[in-house]
A protein has these predicted regions:
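Low-complexity, acidic Ser/Thr/Pro-rich repeat tracts that form intrinsically disordered stalk/linker regions
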Residues: 31-79, 83
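Extracellular glycan-recognition/adhesion modules and their associated mucin-like linkers
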Residues: 384-412, 430-457, 473-500, 515-517
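Alpha-helical cap/lid subdomain in secreted, periplasmic
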Residues: 162-332, 336
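Structural recognition of the beta-strand scaffold that forms the well-ordered cores
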Residues: 84-96, 129-134, 171-176, 181-183, ...
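Histidine-centered active-site loop/cap adjacent to the catalytic His
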Residues: 330-378
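Secretory targeting and sorting signals
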Residues: 1-44
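Short, well-structured alpha-helical segments in soluble
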Residues: 146-168
Length: 517
């Protein structure tokens, strides 16, 4: 929790999946801090309040932890304390899926699966102590003031925050929560994967109709959780500006383009078990809707927002350099296997947490209130962008035809043709221009860029999507008059001959078919 900085197998899988990929932890006693904090007067934003005493049970724990930190149990003034960072939330940030777990959190009576390699322990933010109090399976009720414990030996997460805030000087509070509330992301994933194993058909038709309602239901719960964390910090004597409160969204662990991986191992060996169309639905619909909900909660509550929804694009399960763990069955813990045997599946792996840590480090240094993070050039190194992806992607409309540049069939695999189509606002018609790399990314995935195949800069060459690489044949310049030209062949322009023609290179002639807005 706290650390100083540094055939039969198939049937077993199916049976285990049917139980759950992510197990909702049992709810035990109610936080003993409820009366002390839930009704406490809240200081005005930007002003520190007097420190409110903890209830005896929590004060005892605080004193014990202080003695370990400093050699005595005294509560010190802020300026005399060690600095710290803390993460709260669920399996996405606890370290579930990494494979290395802190003692006491890897079963059999506690499955929080906190990893010493989780993101909060690996940032470049200068801090003396890092706390990871997130727990796999947590919902907002396990985090909020007066909430419920997940396990008998766990505190409500806001109580852990209250203790850390009094013993150290917190610089950043990170919250990743919402997936286990109305959304029930784990059970949905369980169902989708199980249906694939049992040949029962895709899960998209089952969940699409009610998905937005699920998102709408979780938004006020996440927003209320942010408010509670603010209250806990004010009760500990912090002004709102004394620390950074960050809400991070969830990346998609799966995608439909796995066969583009030249070393694709197959779905079962690679762990990307599920219908390809369901993977596309998850990436293109389910996760983006969830992200918008988390963003709304962060914005409405005044938290700093980090959009990580596109962070794993190009690094999904079964892709090269994957940042997420695929379907994984631990046959030895527990034994005999049960629902907990597969709970590590479809979560960030150690590389994924390294990516989170990099994004958080950049966000803290940038001082932004809202930013997005992704590996836009397939370098393996995440980069922070001072934009919200929701606002960055826009349709590209042709001046002559009025049609929009469109990835054919809403596909995103390598070689997908690009042309004109009736403007419809879908993600296969959203585009973002990366100023640094001069690349045009399609909204479907951060990892597919407009590409001149084989770098053949010639009249009539058709444009396609391809894995973003930063290569010269994926670099374009936007010239006066709305033309778009290959950086390596600026006498040629992107051209739409008719409303639904393929997008081609043609000699620049100033015609409306070569102008885009």
């Amino acid at each position: 929790m706290m650390r100083p900085r540094r055939g039969r197998r198939l049937m077993t899988v199916v049976a285990t999946l049917a139980a759950a990929l992510t197990v909702s932890a049992s709810m035990g006693g109610v936080s003993t801090a409820a009366e002390a904090t839930a009704t406490a007067a809240v200081a005005a934003p930007g002003s520190a309040a007097a420190v409110k005493p903890l209830p005896p049970e929590l004060e005892k724990i605080r004193a014990q932890q202080a003695a370990k930190l400093y050699g005595d149990p005294a509560e010190r003034p802020l300026g005399e304390r060690k600095t710290s960072l803390i993460s709260l939330g669920d399996s996405e940030i606890s370290g579930e899926g990494v494979g290395t777990y802190e003692p006491g959190t890897d079963g059999p009576t506690n499955w929080c699966h906190r990893s010493p390699d989780s993101a909060i322990h690996r940032t470049g933010i200068a801090a003396d102590v890092t706390y990871n109090v997130a727990c796999s399976g947590a919902y907002t009720g396990n985090i909020r003031i007066g909430g419920s414990k997940q396990y008998a030996d766990e505190l409500v997460q806001s109580d852990s925050l209250a203790i850390a805030a009094r013993n150290t000087r917190l610089k950043m509070v990170l919250l990743v929560a919402g997936a286990n509330d109305d959304l029930q992301f784990g059970p949905v994933m369980t169902d989708c994967v199980t249906r694939w194993f049992l040949l029962q058909g895709t899960c998209e038709p089952k969940y699409t109709p009610g998905w937005q309602a699920r998102v709408d239901g979780l938004v006020p719960k996440v927003e209320g959780t942010v408010g509670d964390l603010r209250t806990v910090m004010r009760d500990a004597g912090y002004a709102d500006g004394d620390y950074k409160l960050v809400v991070m969204s969830y990346p998609s662990p799966i995608g439909p383009d796995v066969t583009d991986n030249p070393n694709f191992p197959g779905k079962i060996p690679g762990g990307c078990t599920g219908y390809t169309s369901d993977s596309a639905w998850g990436r293109n619909t389910a996760v983006p809707a969830f992200e918008k909900g988390v963003r709304k909660a962060a914005t409405d509550s005044g938290a700093t927002y980090l959009d990580a929804s596109r962070l794993f694009h190009g690094h999904e399960v079964c892709m090269e350099d994957t940042w997420a763990r695929g379907l994984y069955v631990n046959i030895s813990n527990p034994f005999p296997p049960d629902a907990n045997s597969v709970r590590q599946s479809f979560h960030p792996n150690a590389r994924g947490h390294g990516a989170f840590a990099s994004c958080l480090t950049q966000l803290y240094a940038a001082g932004l209130r809202e930013a997005s993070c992704a590996d836009s050039a397939s370098t393996g190194q995440p980069k922070l962008y001072p934009v919200a992806w929701d606002d960055a992607y826009r349709p590209v409309k042709n001046a002559a035809t009025g049609s929009c540049v469109d990835a054919n069939g809403a596909a995103s695999g390598n070689g997908t043709a690009v042309g004109g189509w009736d403007c419809n606002g879908q993600r296969n018609q959203g585009w973002w221009y990366d100023q640094e790399h001069r690349s045009l990314h399609v909204e479907l995935t951060q990892d597919r860029c407009l590409d001149v195949p084989g770098a053949r800069y010639e009249r009539g060459a058709g444009l396609i999507l391809w894995n973003c690489s930063g290569a010269a044949n994926q670099q374009f310049v936007r010239a006066d008059g709305g033309t778009v030209r290959p950086a390596a062949a600026q006498s040629l322009c992107l051209t739409l001959g008719a409303a639904k023609d393929p997008l081609r290179l043609q000699p620049c002639d100033g015609s409306a078919g070569q102008r885009f807005a």
